[in-house]
Design a protein with these regions (language model features):
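Gly/Ser/Thr-rich phosphate-binding loop
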Residues: 18-87, 98, 132
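Hydrophobic alpha-helical segments, especially N-terminal targeting/anchoring helices
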Residues: 4, 102-103, 152, 158
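Flexible loop/turn segments at secondary-structure boundaries
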Residues: 13-17, 43-46, 69-73, 108, ...
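Adenylate-forming AMP-binding core of the ANL superfamily, especially NRPS adenylation
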Residues: 42-45, 78, 84-133, 141-147
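Conserved residues at the C-terminal ends of beta-strands
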Residues: 10, 39, 121
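Conserved ATP-binding/catalytic segment of the ANL
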Residues: 110, 119-180
Length: 186
């Protein structure tokens, strides 16, 4: 008999599974799961609790990752068995990654308990180098909003312990009846 010790899911697969109800997962022995990954969109609190309780049995480490295709790999995430997860938080930057939070005036917010636009201070080995046949667009999209910083397009919160929570896109906003909505709210 072989047992899985880790599994990962994006928000849509998790929502589909959760919509089936708890009865769908009860017949399965998931006790071998030690690590559960979450990717794609930031996970909301209720989904995190469900994933933790129903799939992870309250014992699996939940690894909430933040990355983009353009970053070439995971940038912010807790490390299973090393750093504790916090519901809805990607938590800490991986070694060598130096995120920062910028305010709407282009100033870096250096204190904890901060909210603003997520940027990355310095290059890292897997960073995208350009957009095919459109290097000017690459520079405009990722490096023009905040001087000498990679602009992710995401908002974030940094809590009192320096953990990062991704709050959603700041550059994909819909205005509905006078309310600004990020796609994470829809």
């Amino acid at each position: 008999t072989h047992c899985l010790s880790s599994a990962a899911s994006d928000v849509y697969k998790r929502q589909t599974l959760e919509a089936q109800g708890d009865e769908y997962v009860k017949p399965y022995n998931l006790s071998s799961l030690r690590v559960l990954g979450t990717v794609g969109e930031p996970i909301n609190y209720d989904a995190w609790v469900w994933y933790n309780e129903k799939i992870g049995g309250k014992t699996a480490n939940i690894v909430d990752t933040w990355w983009q295709t353009e970053t070439g790999g995971i940038m912010i995430s807790n490390l299973a068995g090393i750093s504790r997860s916090k519901p809805t938080y990607a938590t800490f930057p991986l070694p060598g990654i130096q995120p920062c939070i910028m305010d709407e005036n282009g100033n870096e917010i250096t204190s904890n308990n901060a909210e603003g636009s997520l940027c990355i201070k310095y290059p890292w080995p897997s960073i995208a180098r350009s957009i095919y046949n459109d290097h000017d667009r690459f520079k405009s999209v990722y490096f023009s909003s905040f001087k000498n910083k990679y602009f992710t397009g995401d908002g974030c919160i940094r809590d009192e312990k320096g953990r990062y929570k991704i709050t959603g896109r700041v550059d994909d906003i819909l205005i509905v009846s006078g309310h600004n909505l990020s796609l994470i709210h829809i």
